[in-house]
Curated annotation (Swiss-Prot):
GO terms for cellular component: cytoplasm; cytosol. Its EC number is 2.5.1.15. Residues 15-267 form the Pterin-binding domain. InterPro entries: DHP_synth-like, DHP_synth_dom, Dihydropteroate_synth-like_sf, Pterin-binding_dom. Catalyzes the condensation of para-aminobenzoate (pABA) with 6-hydroxymethyl-7,8-dihydropterin diphosphate (DHPt-PP) to form 7,8-dihydropteroate (H2Pte), the immediate precursor of folate derivatives. The keyword Metal-binding applies. This is Dihydropteroate synthase. Optimum pH is 8.5. One of its GO terms (biological process) is response to xenobiotic stimulus.
Amino acid sequence: MKLFAQGTSLDLSHPHVMGILNVTPDSFSDGGTHNSLIDAVKHANLMINAGATIIDVGGESTRPGAAEVSVEEELQRVIPVVEAIAQRFEVWISVDTSKPEVIRESAKVGAHIINDIRSLSEPGALEAAAETGLPVCLMHMQGNPKTMQEAPKYDDVFAEVNRYFIEQIARCEQAGIAKEKLLLDPGFGFGKNLSHNYSLLARLAEFHHFNLPLLVGMSRKSMIGQLLNVGPSERLSGSLACAVIAAMQGAHIIRVHDVKETVEAMRVVEATLSAKENKRYE
């Protein structure tokens, strides 16, 4: 399985680590730390050196209760960073946005993936994504970031997320986005309580029936904090456990804050999966 964008390809035969680069003042875990262009590029460089093969740039916090950001503000935050990374590094760049203007401008300056938590539901986003021809990650969310964690409710969380993916894939194909350009993200922590999150993690492998890349983001989230009763800065071990559980089930892209540690964990996963395939247990 491969993704193609900007004249390059990403081989998904092994798990990739996507490093999170929030250029926001209010993200839940690292808001305000990479706001200047120099700081953002430095942090991207650190993550690339640690083994990240994708950098996910986000200019609007999507934590529960987050305030919305204007188009102008998001463009000012995101575009210079995407452009600077594209000019300096041989790395895939993902842009975490829902706005058509940011989708278009990001593509022009070198972005490879559109990572939209709203699955191109904002007016004009679907058309903008189709125009760029870039791969798109579709994510499931119940409600919106402001209200999603108030009282998430499902009869069957796996069935509902699965049905959502079916509908969104069809919607993208009708708009001219080829199925092979799509990635799927179950949306851990987006309109889901503790039991919903772990139900999805336990059944992650079942989403392979779509034959599309799976992207997961659980790093430092409340599904770990609530379980272990620790704050965001103390969630590394839980984040690594979630990353390993996902990768052992064939997740293709793991979106994280702690790149070095996750890359090392993925090497252990790869060695295990390859031993399983080869039936070599020396």
